[in-house]
C-alpha cells in the first residue's frame, strides 16, 4: 500500500492501523461468511441493541488487535459499556465492529467504523477516521488531511482515488421513521425528488455514507437521535468534512457542526446530516427555525 499521501502528525498511527486491518481482512471476512453469522444472540449491548454473532466475534478480534498496538492507550467498542485501557500509549480508538448488522441477513453492504482520538473521547480530539466496507469487494476509506479510498486485492489495499465531493449530488439516503419527520424535512426531501434525486437508503449507515462519497455528492440524514456519536457519527462526520462536505445537526432550528458537539456519556446519540454543499444549503433553508 502507498502511504506517501498521508501527512501530518497522526499519519504514523493511521498507517499502523491500516497495516493491522490489511492483515486481518481475511479473518474478518471469514467471520462474516459463517452460516450463522447473522443470527441474533440473547444478549443486549450497552446501547440497548441485540447483537448478532458476527458483531461479537468481530468485536473480540478487533479489540485484541487494537490493544496489540504500542501507541494505543484505550480501545472502546460500541458493544461494551466502558473502554479497555492500557497504561501506556497516546491514542484512543472508538469503533463499531459491524455497522449495518441488522441488514446483514439480506446480504447488504456492512462495515467497520473506526475513530482515532487523542487524549479523550471528544469530537474535538478526533484525529482521523477509517471504515472498511464488506461487499462483493472490500474497500477502505481513510480521513486524515484528505479522504483516501482503497480496494483490497491480493492481500493488499490498493489506492483508488482521493475523494472530493462536488457541490451538488444526485442521491438521498434518508433514514428514520418518515411519519416522525418534521414538515421542513419533508419539504426538503420533496424538493430533492422533484429535482430527480434518487433514494438510496439501505439501513446500513456506513454503506449509505460510502455511496454518497463514491458518487461525489448527495445527502445522508437521520433526524432521530439514534446514531452513536463516538462510534458512528463523529468518524463519518470527519469523513464528509475532509471531503469538502458538511456534517451538521439542528439545535432549536439552528444548524450546528456535529464535530462541535459535546459528549455527556459514552453511548450518547445524535441526529445526523451529512451532505455536499448544495444539499446542506437546502436542508438549512427548510429546517431553519424548526
From Swiss-Prot:
Positions binding substrate in this chain are 99-102, 201, 226
Binding note for cofactor: Binds 2 magnesium ions per subunit.
The keyword Magnesium is annotated on this UniProt entry: yes
Binding residues annotated for Mg(2+) 2, in chain numbering: 96, 99, 232
Kindly indicate whether the keyword Cytoplasm belongs to this entry. yes
| One GO MF term | magnesium ion binding
- Pfam families hit by this protein: FBPase, FBPase_C
Q: Keywords in alphabetical order, please.
A: Carbohydrate metabolism, Cytoplasm, Hydrolase, Magnesium, Metal-binding
Tree of life domain: Bacteria
EC number annotated for this UniProt entry: 3.1.3.11
Q: Which GO terms describe its biological process?
A: fructose 1,6-bisphosphate metabolic process; fructose 6-phosphate metabolic process; fructose metabolic process; gluconeogenesis
Q: What cofactor is this protein dependent on?
A: Mg(2+)
Top enzyme category = hydrolase
The record's annotation in SUPFAM superfamilies points to: Carbohydrate phosphatase
Q: Name one GO cellular component term.
A: cytosol
Q: In which pathway does it act?
A: Carbohydrate biosynthesis; gluconeogenesis
Q: Could you say which residues bind Mg(2+) 1 here?
A: 78, 96, 98
- Substrates-to-products reaction catalysed: beta-D-fructose 1,6-bisphosphate + H2O = beta-D-fructose 6-phosphate + phosphate
Give the UniProt subcellular location, in the record's own words: Cytoplasm
The UniProt subunit note reads as follows: Homotetramer.
Q: Which family does the record assign?
A: Belongs to the FBPase class 1 family.
Could you identify this protein by its name?
A: Fructose-1,6-bisphosphatase class 1
| Lineage of the organism | Bacteria, Pseudomonadati, Campylobacterota, Epsilonproteobacteria, Campylobacterales
